[in-house]
């Protein structure tokens, strides 16, 4: 009896953790990790090189630019 109750409680906890993360938010994170814009600092992902974000796209920095404007 205790094993059944424990199994039900564990199943409920796992389901609540899965339901807490919306599918659209997880998809957005995977797109950002592939080189999209990082809104907190306006730079693109480090893997995409020295680029700034312009809207939702990454643009190349010139040799003289060291920060992202705007």
Curated annotation (Swiss-Prot):
Keyword Transcription tagged: no
Signal peptide: 1-20
UniProt xrefs under SUPFAM superfamilies: omega toxin-like (SSF57059)
Annotated tissue distribution: Expressed by the venom gland.
Pfam families in the cross-refs: Toxin_7 (PF05980)
Keywords noted in UniProt: Amidation, Disulfide bond, Knottin, Neurotoxin, Secreted, Signal, Toxin
Any Gene Ontology CC annotation: extracellular region
Cystines in this chain: 37-53, 44-58, 52-68
Molecular function per GO: toxin activity
Compartmental location: Secreted
Propeptide: 21-34
Residues where Leucine amide is found: 69
Entry function: Insect active toxin causing rapid but reversible paralysis in crickets. No activity shown in mammals. Does not show effect on mammalian voltage-gated calcium channels.
Domains (record comment): The presence of a 'disulfide through disulfide knot' structurally defines this protein as a knottin.
Family designation: Belongs to the neurotoxin 01 (U2-agtx) family.
Listed name of the protein: U2-agatoxin-Ao1p
Species this chain originates from: Agelena orientalis (Funnel-web spider)
């Amino acid at each position: 009896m205790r094993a059944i109750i424990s199994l039900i409680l564990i199943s409920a906890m796992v389901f609540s953790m899965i339901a807490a993360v919306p599918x659209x938010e997880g998809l957005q994170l995977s797109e950002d990790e592939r080189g999209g814009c990082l809104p907190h600092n306006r730079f693109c992902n480090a893997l995409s090189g020295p680029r700034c974000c312009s809207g939702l796209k990454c643009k190349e920095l010139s040799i003289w630019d060291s920060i992202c404007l705007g």
